[in-house]
């Protein structure tokens, strides 16, 4: 996206790595990283194919544009179609120029400040991005019930969270969960399968690999 939609896309993509343990989601904003903190006027007017040079038919591209006519986003969607990728457009205008395999129209109406789409339109876009990324990750097996079992244990807070996830998912006490998590190299999903299936972490990892990461199938 460009401007606010681009920042929202980058924000949602950035959260997928720690939450779901995947680097497969990348945010792209017109004007590059500098546009995250500074308005780069004019960046939205043209799309540079180099921004998506590595896009393939195995990918999906989500373009976000409140007006449905931002040149940068329309160019990105066209580039993705040419590459054979799945395309999704999130827009806030009915019948806009944005063309995609899936078009999500959020009819949020006029802004309190006319034209300031960082307000109602941006809020609605973020809600949809949350729902979209979370539902995709659930479908890919990166959650078990309401628990983010692929969480990356990169700090003390997330370590405590991972222990609680293992404890609750496996129905064990905190001491057992802590030991299982340590034995599994900090990987909550592996610890859960090991505890519920009564196997060691190595066998749990093999089961998860066979099940393409889905805890239920691994059990």
Regions found by a protein language model. Give the residues of each.
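Short, amphipathic alpha-helical interaction segments embedded in low-complexity terminal/linker regions
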Residues: 22, 131, 136-219
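Glycine-rich phosphate-binding loops that contact phosphosugars or nucleotide phosphates
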Residues: 2-128, 136-140
